[in-house]
Amino acid sequence: TLRVLEKVVPFEIKRVYFIHCSEGTERGGHRHKSTTQALICINGSCVISNHDGNKKEDFLLDSSSKCLILNPEDWHIMHKFNNNATLLVLASTLYDVNDYI
């Protein structure tokens, strides 16, 4: 299956990385000052718990056809990874430790 992302992602991609976790692992627990991210689970599944300041929502990413956009103000936790889960993250900025809150 071929997935084309350039019309889905609403920003210029500056950084790409993968998160590969074992079951029971939790990642995130922060938000960013200026980075927007696109999350795609390219293998397996995981849940993204997101709080935008007004409401909390859980998103199941279980297909490479699903892309979740996280804005800088979104507090997020990535969890409930199944054993083969690989999460692709596309970011609007280069890595900067000072961008994390």
What are these regions (language model features)?
Residues 61-81:
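Conserved metal-binding segment of the jelly-roll/cupin
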